[in-house]
Amino acid sequence: MRYLSVAEIAKKWDVSERSVRNYCAQGRVNGAFLTGKIWNIPENAEKPERINKRKEEPLTLLDILKEQKASKYSGGIYHKTQIDLTYNSNHIEGSRLTHDQTRYIFETNTIGVEKEVLNVDDVIETANHFRCIDMIIDHAKAALTEKFIKELHLVLKNGTSDSRKDWFAVGDYKKLPNEAGGMDTALPEEVADKMKALLTEYNAKEEKTFEDILDFHVKFERIHPFQNGNGRVGRLIMFKECLKYNIVPFIIEDNLKMFYYRGLKEWDNEKGYLTDTCLTAQDKYKAYLDYFRIGY
């Protein structure tokens, strides 16, 4: 085996000779030995890592969303998520704004239309939904609570025509019975207890799986705790929980709408309907991550 001097190794490793001698004296260079006062170092010896050098963990999607949100970075995954999630989640619920109009509101905080009538609530709820997405990014790691869920609803419906109705509780549970997709939901007097039980059951699980998140969503939608806005709040919760547990999130688009509704309805009999629908949506979001070179 060929041995090199301290000076030769220092040049090879691009460090000072003093650092090389310290590494050798600390026993951190395999095969190095002294001949008198001269260190003999194997030519294939590897440079020791600095003790205080912290191994960098790869950034998660949540880390990147937080960074891009804070820096107001345009054209990245945060920008795309805000527009696509808002447009699709509102569109499922009947919003008539186009994808381009949604993007324009996000990018400019204005909307320009010619020879077209827009529903004011569609515009307000779009702007509000952007704020809701910021909330789930900021609080992604926090435990899911009734308080947070109610805050999402409050922000989503703030300033809408619903908020001016006496019988509509903004940021609180429903006052009147309602149905979802032709199915009965929890009665107003049952909602608080059912929500507490659902959250207790869900939060008792230390690590949530993809199926756990979908199961919570189904049960949440069946309770239908709010007078209106349950679907959007429910999908925001799913996105938040995926971020928390480093699961690739997903956006239910219009072409998946009927499969999504079927999955909610048939969950007890066949979990595969909803699971496959959400996995299809997840594949599309993975394509976004691939494009932006974000690992998952």
PLM features: what roles do these ranges have?
Residues R2-W13, E17-V29, L34-Y296:
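FIC/Doc superfamily catalytic core
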